[in-house]
Amino acid sequence: MSYSTQQDILDFVEDNNVKFVRFAFCDIFGTQKNIAVLANDLPKALEDGVCFDGSSIAGFMKVEESDLVLRPDLSTVTILPWRPTEGRVMQFFCDVEKPDGQPFGGNCRGFLRSVNRKFKKLGITCNVGAECEFYLFENDDRGRPTRIPIDFGGYFDMAPLDAGENLRRDICLTMEQMGMSPQHSHHESGNGQNEIDCHHAGPLKTADNVMMFKQIVRAIATRSGIHASFLPKPLPDQAGSGLHINLSLYMDGRNLFEGDIAPDSIAGSFMAGVLAHSRELTVFTNPLPNSYQRFGCDEAPRYVSWSRQNRSQLVRIPQVKGDNCRMELRSPDPACNPYLAIGLVLAAGLDGIENRMVLSAPVNKNLFDPSMAEGLGLETLPASLEEAVQAAEESEFLRRVLPEQLASRYFAEELKRCEALKHASDPVEYERTHYFNAI
């Protein structure tokens, strides 16, 4: 669907028996929220926006200044096909504004949009792709999630070892119905672990797609009596789940990641910026205490380094051709806010370009074996959420690029997570129990 005017939207609502319209957005951690507007009230909502209590959303507003307004992005309209066909449900992604129309510092979509505009001013087009992994678990007789994966399959296995094949098919077909472009679907390394990848798109479109993808997976899994979890490390003895971010840059129609990458080229400087700021970005790409159980094993990096092909590196350049040429950042996990994660990775790369950073030499060693890193002098990613918060709070780069309100409230909420974990009698079980159903 592609609609640009309010009248286009109203005509579509009438022609398609739409009765409910969701105005969707997310808090600073990427948890999706929404308010449903009945179709009869949609004209006013499109004209004036929808007012809501920002003090009730994590990291948004104080009680004494709580009013905020949702402004729908008309280009994101879509029907939710798993909802009833009679009295259909439609959804927009929204930006968040202050009541006077001024920008709101916690509007994560707005932050990503502003970073992308800076690239456009340089004549650079950014394409972003996301590889999202997730687990599928059985529910008990009362419909509550268990820790029992739906199968004992492994990487690229087929049925009957792969019990999620039909569910992945339903997810991909639903994505296509909603205008998304799934590319690959397969069983991952862990028991009950799955991956579905989307074709690359613009940064904002990809972040919207990640949010919608998680919504689709949960809805279809629930309909099938299965629990879907995007927790980075739901099972201690199985692979962690990542959200690998793939990025390519185009200038004058040419993919800057195609061919050899000179250390001082635009692509080289972009990569250098991402590597230089990777430690301070980690609190945004890996926002849970549980996230840090994934690093250093199961194809999740620990060291700040890059290479071609090598999956033990933080950044790698896949050996592909043409428009598929790209860099892949392997640290992010699916608990992150995709607007902030993608926006900050792009901002780090832009900082590298603007300051003409020079890309370091590649590290062609298997860094999943810690002994291979000895003597190389490599930085490591933070080993805990608390360490990640400290790195971010000390970052001059983040003070420059992030709205102060968003940064300070994000860090404060993350420190609360650290304190809650410290006071838990069983920290590992606390975080799995506390986040297992929510992420």
Model-derived segments and spans:
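Glycine-rich, acidic/polar active-site loops that bind/position phosphate-bearing ligands
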Residues: 1-439
